Amino acid sequence: MSENAIEGARVVQLEVPDLDGGLRAKLVSAAKALSPAGAAMCTIMFGLTQADDVYESPASSSDNGFPDLLMRPDMATARPLPWCEDTAAVLCDLYGPDGALYPVAPRTVLRTVADRCAELGFEARFAAEFELCVVHQGDDAVPLGRTMNAYSLLRLRELRPLAQAFFERMEAVGIPIESVHTELGHGMLEFAISHAPAGEAADHAARAKAYLKELCGEMGLVATFMPKWRSGAPTSGCHFHQSLWRDGDNAFWSDDGGLSALARQYLAGQLVTMADVSVLFNPSVNAYRRLQPGTWTPVTASWGVDNRTAAIRAIAGSPKGARLEHRRAGADVNPYLAIAAMLAGGLHGIAEKLEAPDPATGDAVADGRFPRLATTLADAVDALRGSEVAPGLLGREFVDHYLLSREVELRLWREWEAEQVTEWEHRRYFETS
């Protein structure tokens, strides 16, 4: 796509990913979108929590007057939105007052890592799979459908109108959805996106989530990517498939039918950095309610061949299909930051020529060779704060700002939690005390 998509529109939706992976947007005229002066967005966007609590940071505060950022459209992402009359959408890169790419912006973080990969002669390709729950609008939040079976033909009757509309919309904006199917649990679904270069894959993931939410709203539904949306409900994760390519060939493939030596170095780098950057895969308090043993959710920095109990599942497959599946992230993940963390970790392994341990051959959780990962947001924040390698992987300024954002999230949670009296406490102590 190009400027033609914008020139044919009356209104342009300028989209920017925030720290939590949501798309913030501004509607402008086509003339404004194409103007060399561009549109602006206040730096406070990176001083907002997911619920829009405001906090100050060195990047945006009363000390510097909360300056503007320049929104520069990435015309490769310009798309007409057929479901919105005379409207196009385009993702934007953000530039600071100094004229440089804004280092805190998730798109900038990923671009920097992807450029590093390109300098080594590789193209990184990623594909995301998202699990989610769809419920009917209303205070009762009744899940879509009456049955809870995975891969259910029966449930497809209930799902089909939403799935078909989703396929149509994604095709219209150039997002290649490979599949949609039911998952275990009432209202639980999964969709998979085809692989693409790292930055494009993140764009696809962020847009697919946002546009699916919009579609569900039009149909009287709500789509939630909350990892555990209510007590007793199944959980939602996000799995990323990844590989490196050079001159049209998959660098993860070995002629002996297994993973190449380079793939094992890349894998080793992800394993040794996983604990440090775990908060980027699981960025919320709720994310850790998903990470329980025995639920196919990885709790160790582990790997195995076609092993779904491990954090990284190696799939040798074929010359075109050899890849690694990273299974740690929750569905609330920011795809830009997760892909940046995975790719940076893998490149670290290649640069240091790290060796991966032998794979887990059974339950990776029970394999004592693999270190445990954070089980709370507080532990994950501490791991990033104490990391010696993360600033080099993702940039000091970004790491410091992201730490601040998660510390704010923790503080707000602890303040709320301190005021709560649980049902368990009430049942146990009300009459006996």
What feature does the model see in each segment?
Residues M1-S179, R372-S433:
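ATP/Mg2+-dependent ligation/transfer catalytic cores
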Residues D18-D20, Y95-L101, R155, H195-A201, ...:
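A generic structural motif
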Residues R79-D86, E123-R125, V180-L184, A233, ...:
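Short glycine/proline-enriched loop/turn "hinge" motifs that connect secondary-structure elements
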Residues F130-V134, E183-F191:
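Short, conserved phosphate-binding/catalytic loop or strand-edge motifs used
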Residues P143-L153, H186-A201, R230-T235, D247-F252:
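Active-site-proximal beta-alpha loop/turn segments in soluble metabolic enzymes
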Residues L156-L159, A163-F166, E171-I177, F191-A198, ...:
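Accessory "access/gating" subregions that flank catalytic or transport cores
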Residues A201-Q270:
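Acidic, glycine-rich loop-and-beta core segments that form the ion-binding/anion-interacting portion
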Residues L221-V222, R246-S433:
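Catalytic-core signal marking the mid-to-C-terminal active-site face
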